[in-house]
Amino acid sequence: MTYCHQFLSNLSSLTRFRLHTGNVNGYTQLKVRRFETSAEELSACLDLQLSSNPIAADFKENSCLLLCDNDHMDNYERDEIKITMKVFLSAWDVQQIDQAVTSLKEQLKTKDIEVLILSFPELDLIDGESEDDEHRRWFEKVKPLYTYMEKLVETSEIASIGVSDFSARQLKEVLEHFDVKPSINHVRLDGCCQVPPELQALANDHDVQLLVHNDPTPFPTNNIFKTFCEIDSGCQKAVCSPLFETTWLSRYSVWVRKRSIMTSKGYIVQFIRKHD
């Protein structure tokens, strides 16, 4: 039995699995390139990994497939590093947050994470809905997810909360409603070079960092992972695209505190079996 057929056999018994790139900072080819978006970086990473290494047939603990050596923080004590993660949700589902946080803690062998930034799903539009009604509907979706992140802070699993692409109105709503305030708002400056003044003033008044990102919205996870799901490798068929689809994706980085050096960066994505 070839490794590819063994891989397919292992997949057949799973309802879900996770793919972990490992530390992508180990690839010089990626470090010297400039990517317009993080999606381009992830796609290039997968192309490089899957063209240079055969697909592993065996899954690690908790059905996680590691694509390269997970060299991240073994040379540092835990208090010497800072771990940040950003989770891209495909649905308004608390379980996706729980799974992403649990998976990263398992992969990095840590009990806690310093910063969790959440990228919320796009809200479905309703024809004829007023802006105020849309905002109220959005906030009802946000409440249970943000409440869950507050619980993660209370249990010391994460130290601080971040949000992504919140307008001034959205950020104000969260600041007024929740006890644990966001410390970061990830913003993408499409077509302009400065943050809207109202958002900047609100962030200054509440000590919220406005950090610029290059993540597309929504993150095109399924399109990127066609690279993985359509690997041929002697099987003469797509490996997993007929069986699985992606749900959440997380990106993490590990920083050395006193030196401001990123020692590791990687991606984890979850696949679930498609319903017939």
Residue ranges and their predicted role:
Residues 68-78, 104-110, 175:
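Acidic (Asp/Glu)-rich catalytic clusters
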